[in-house]
């Protein structure tokens, strides 16, 4: 499918948040919520769908979907049980697991595409998100944790897009799973809080640490701080910090961290902000780290 064909289809879906941006990997990304401009839809209904379409040379090469209606050629759909995937020949994604070492995503090659289905490992263990890429582009190469010497000085526009997309993906998860016991399942994005998140992201990057409770923590302890926050640094959790990742990778990693997930679904939170920065560990090793302000309650309470 070409870019023009995509735009023709989107024009009939009352989409909002439709925009084109560059991903960190250099793809053109069209992001949208189907029905987002439909005045008959409720707040939650508008946030129940979020789709990212990846293009290279104006040709669609991949798609990430978070929606209760998503389905890929009858092979996998929203709500498919992880056990069913395994029975049908899907394999664990070895670089994407929970802190307990349990599978949180499954992969299968179909025709000329690689599909990754993300399952809610800390919930009902059913599929809530699907990512598909042409085999010419490796999803693992885009998201698997690895050292890199690629420039990570992303523009402010790219960082803003990453923040927005992460927020949208998390909201689609919250609405479709119904894990929040409140009338509105989706969180509201607060500009003031987002500004704090962005500033705090920069502070963390400048201090060379990750821990929200103590921005002065030395780098040698930052890995321990990640693990204490419920993130497995040696497996999927490290993807939160790698520079060569996409928004869906970060959002799903938040979901698969038990502590972050519990914070995310808490009924105490009705809004959130997301910040992003470039964090450099040492010469030749640049990593990308976005963070959610709902994990940093000490900062929010001061507003």
Language-model-detected regions and their locations in the chain:
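Secretory-pathway/luminal and periplasmic proteins that interact with or process carbohydrate-rich
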Residues: 16, 95, 199-213, 234, ...
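Intrinsically disordered, low-complexity
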Residues: 117-186, 301-303
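A well-ordered secondary-structure block
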Residues: 55-57, 62-114, 220-302
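Short, well-ordered surface patches within globular domains
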Residues: 157-225, 270-272
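A short, polar/proline- and glycine-enriched secondary-structure boundary/capping micro-motif
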Residues: 17, 71-76, 139-143
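Non-transmembrane alpha-helical segments in soluble domains
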Residues: 7, 86, 171, 198-205, ...
């Amino acid at each position: 499918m070409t870019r023009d064909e995509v735009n023709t289809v989107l024009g009939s879906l009352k989409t909002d948040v439709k925009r084109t941006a560059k991903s960190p990997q250099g793809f053109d990304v069209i992001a949208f919520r189907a029905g987002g401009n439909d005045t008959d839809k409720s707040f939650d209904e508008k946030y129940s769908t979020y789709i990212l379409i990846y293009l290279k040379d104006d040709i669609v090469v991949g798609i990430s979907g978070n929606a209760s209606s998503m389905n890929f050629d009858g092979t996998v759909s929203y709500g498919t049980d992880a056990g069913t995937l395994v029975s049908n020949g899907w394999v664990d994604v070895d670089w994407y697991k929970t802190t307990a070492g349990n599978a949180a995503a499954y992969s299968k090659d179909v025709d000329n595409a690689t599909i990754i289905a993300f399952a809610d490992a800390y919930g009902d263990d059913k599929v809530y998100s699907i990512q598909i890429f042409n085999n010419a582009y490796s999803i693992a190469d885009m998201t698997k944790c690895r050292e890199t010497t690629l420039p990570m000085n992303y523009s402010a526009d790219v960082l803003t897009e990453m923040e927005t997309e992460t927020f949208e993906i998390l909201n689609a998860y919250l609405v479709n799973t119904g894990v929040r016991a409140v009338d509105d399942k989706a969180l509201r994005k607060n500009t003031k809080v987002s500004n704090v998140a962005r500033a705090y992201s920069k502070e963390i990057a400048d201090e060379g640490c990750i821990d929200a409770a103590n921005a002065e923590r030395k780098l040698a302890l930052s890995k321990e701080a990640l693990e204490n926050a419920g993130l497995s640094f040696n497996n999927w959790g490290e993807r939160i910090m790698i520079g060569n990742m996409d928004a869906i990778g970060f959002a799903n990693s938040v979901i698969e961290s038990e502590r972050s997930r519990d914070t995310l679904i808490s009924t105490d939170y009705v809004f959130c902000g997301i910040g992003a920065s470039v964090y450099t560990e040492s010469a030749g090793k640049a990593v990308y780290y976005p963070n959610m302000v709902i994990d940093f309650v000490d900062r929010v309470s001061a507003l």
